[in-house]
């Protein structure tokens, strides 16, 4: 018997759909009750021991057949009351109307051992009223990617939803991976995602777009009371303080993305968390050879709206859509603009902090922003790996800056040789700056190690684990998870996980470009 205790405030305090079941429908409520659809043979593939501990689940319970049944969608623990949430959103810059949880079903809000609230949500557990004709399922490859990235991002220090479990369903799912007319049967899986809240910008956009100001206000009041309890005040002042905090949290999240080289890939407003958490791991990727114009999403290959370098601007635009949705609650629009200004101020402050940390400086001067921009330009021109470049700078000697320190960061040997003079020039400039800085060498290196990961979840690493799992060997998933639990540490015997992208992965599906098919 589980020790999980549930307090399902969302279902209790927001208006729900009087009809139950997964029949497709437009509704003017916050949520719909829907049960997961049973699967043939649920089996646990991997789990996060840390997340289980927070929830109070011990090893015996995780290993039990009942656990796989519950988190495979075949059973419920006492207190679980499954629901799917209704929301809208802007997708690739255009209003898309009602969207909702098309294949995500929340089981309940569990109270953790730390007293925190943790919503447990199954992704791939079958159709809901918001599935828009789809089957509500997920394939193993995308589920592995979501499971691993949720935990990898947490250990990188990036605000994120978490993952408790990855369960194979024993059923096949038909998907056309690149929407090119070649559907295939793939193994199915279900991820249990965990977050204090899965509320998105789109939860506020939909009722506002429909003119349902009463429901909009209910969403705002509920969100503040449950998820922002420290906020004080009332009325418009309370709403203004809340919106400013949403903007600040979003800025912090995106600044972390830019620090570690993460590209979300599909920053639609329905994929933006009101808590400033990274949510919905689809066609994401990590920057290998530095390119601010890179996106891993094939759907965005032409427009590149969601490319790496524009993520801060897109986040600001998305917050603008949220402000637009909230405008009916504000007689004076000035507080909304103030919130948007807080995003810019917070992001710039984070960027300066991260610049100092990544370069090992006590503080960031204005000229240091120029210094790091010059490095980025050099990385782009010379096809240098972002992660390996910054990590390689840690052990650089300010007295004898040697370009050989960064040899492993180059993808093209000819460019390494040709661009050696420019790199030497930049290193000398950097070394001169270090000699002016008050941080002792040991403190500098320690600061840099905490800002520049050695291990990131490169797409080719995830794909190797997927390949093994699809052949019946899931051990690679847990092994990769263990590596990503300590991304800033040097891990003896695990150098292969820190290597730059191999040439075979440059253009391979799943390693360079991905689709939204999952």
From Swiss-Prot:
Catalytic reactions of this protein: L-seryl-[protein] + ATP = 3-O-(5'-adenylyl)-L-seryl-[protein] + diphosphate; L-threonyl-[protein] + ATP = 3-O-(5'-adenylyl)-L-threonyl-[protein] + diphosphate; L-tyrosyl-[protein] + ATP = O-(5'-adenylyl)-L-tyrosyl-[protein] + diphosphate; L-histidyl-[protein] + UTP = N(tele)-(5'-uridylyl)-L-histidyl-[protein] + diphosphate
A molecular function (GO) term: magnesium ion binding
EC number, as in UniProt: 2.7.7.-, 2.7.7.108
Task of the protein: Nucleotidyltransferase involved in the post-translational modification of proteins. It can catalyze the addition of adenosine monophosphate (AMP) or uridine monophosphate (UMP) to a protein, resulting in modifications known as AMPylation and UMPylation.
Domain of life according to the entry: Bacteria
Classification via InterPro entries: SelO (IPR003846)
UniProt-annotated catalytic positions: 270
Classification via PANTHER family: PROTEIN ADENYLYLTRANSFERASE SELO, MITOCHONDRIAL
Sequence segments annotated as region (Disordered): 1-23
Binding site for Mg(2+): 271, 280
Protein's UniProt name: Protein nucleotidyltransferase YdiU
Residues annotated to bind ATP: 100, 102-103, 123, 135-136, 193, 200, 280
Family named by the database record: Belongs to the SELO family.
Enzyme class: transferase
Record keywords: ATP-binding, Magnesium, Manganese, Metal-binding, Nucleotide-binding, Nucleotidyltransferase, Transferase
